[in-house]
Amino acid sequence: MRGIRDPRLIPIAEKVMEGKRLSFEDGLVLYQTKDLPTLMRLANLVRERKHGHKTYFVHSIRVSQTNICYVGCTFCAFQRRFGEEGAWDWDVDEVVAWVKERYQPGLTEIHLTAGHHPKRPFAYYLDLVRALKENFPGVQVKAWTAAEIHHFSKIARLPYREVLKALKEAGLDAMPGGGAEIFAERVRRKIARAKVSAEGWLEIHRTAHELGIPTNATMLYGHIETLEERLDHMDRLRRLQDETGGFMSFIPLAFQPDGNQLARELGKKEFTTGLDDLRNLAVARLYLDNFPHIKGYWATLTPELAQVSLDWGVTDVDGTLIEERIVHMAGSPTPQGLTKRELARIILMAGRIPVERDALYREVRVWDRVEA
């Protein structure tokens, strides 16, 4: 590869072009280099080797049945206590009614994540999955992070495997990747002390994969973590993916510095920079060689930067969302949803091929043009 300005990238580029795995030290170089054009070219080489110009999105709706939560993560602006202003807590019928009001033809995914409610029994969550599958046949339910599965395990006094088996029998199709934050214990003690441990998160996803439940993985960055801790997070995911092959995508999530305790403690008002976001996506694409997709989540990146990210290793921009709440309550300035046409246009204008998918990355439609 010609035009490499940082000599440290030469052996890394050779590995990438030969399809060889990068080391932890290689990953640190990618985070440190100022040769961003080469970093971009390498990440794009891998994305096109895996998927060509195809870029995926899903027709989805986001549902948060409650924001009542006892966990107290310091980065969260979503959580509320009982009786607190802005708190909500829906029963099964209210969730179904809410989705029906916003249902659009062609919807393929209902994405459920919410607070850790201290009083709802596990049966409520099973009933909710069943009700959604019954009322919206053919729509896939992607529901509850490993942190929520850990919570269900505690309230039901059941091992992870039994919780996941019951959810799958109720109709669960896939799991999102939230709750991972940063695996480093130093960071988790500060930002998510009461949440599932890193080891617990990984064990839940390992168990889900063994049961045939595909999952995703996230990383929250741009707060107090170091570059080494970001890479350690990816390294643990890569090792689990070697073992199970059950992850579909990796989604880096930029910290949103509004209305939360962590931002106030840090005196932080600025969002991550575009270059940090793009570098992070590129490093992920190069380091996580066994992950099918790296997702540029437009709700935190902005639609414009998500479009640029398609040259930095990204092959998925998430979906229509339809009233996403969690990152927007933390200050994300992006829209709460985009139409399929808007997403397809973003992808087409970047010179890529828009592919509408379902929750399991099965192709639904290839968009060859977008009508004005």
Swiss-Prot record:
Q: Name one GO molecular function term.
A: iron ion binding
Q: Which cofactor does it need?
A: [4Fe-4S] cluster
| InterPro entries per UniProt | Aldolase_TIM, CofH/MnqC-like_C, Elp3/MiaA/NifB-like_rSAM, F420, FO_synthase_su2, MqnE, rSAM
| Pathways per UniProt | Quinol/quinone metabolism; menaquinone biosynthesis
Q: Where does [4Fe-4S] cluster bind?
A: 69, 73, 76
Q: Which domain of life does the protein's organism represent? A: Bacteria
Instruction: Return the EC number.
Output: 2.5.1.120
Q: Gene3D superfamilies this protein is in? A: Aldolase class I
Which reaction(s) are listed as its catalytic activity? Answer: 3-[(1-carboxyvinyl)-oxy]benzoate + S-adenosyl-L-methionine + H2O = 6-amino-6-deoxyfutalosine + hydrogencarbonate + L-methionine + H(+)
Write down how the cofactor binds this protein.
Binds 1 [4Fe-4S] cluster. The cluster is likely coordinated with 3 cysteines and an exchangeable S-adenosyl-L-methionine.
Q: Which GO terms describe its biological process?
A: menaquinone biosynthetic process
The UniProt keywords, alphabetically, are:
4Fe-4S, Iron, Iron-sulfur, Menaquinone biosynthesis, Metal-binding, S-adenosyl-L-methionine, Transferase
Q: Which CDD domains match?
A: Radical_SAM
Q: Where is the Radical SAM core domain?
A: 53-292
Instruction: State the family it belongs to.
Output: Belongs to the radical SAM superfamily. MqnE family.
Give the function comment from the record: Radical SAM enzyme that catalyzes the addition of the adenosyl radical to the double bond of 3-[(1-carboxyvinyl)oxy]benzoate, leading to aminodeoxyfutalosine (AFL), a key intermediate in the formation of menaquinone (MK, vitamin K2) from chorismate.
Q: What is this protein called?
A: Aminodeoxyfutalosine synthase
Q: Give the species this sequence originates from.
A: Thermus thermophilus (strain ATCC 27634 / DSM 579 / HB8)
Q: Identify the taxonomic lineage of the organism of origin.
A: Bacteria, Thermotogati, Deinococcota, Deinococci, Thermales
Quote the gene name from the UniProt entry.
Answer: mqnE
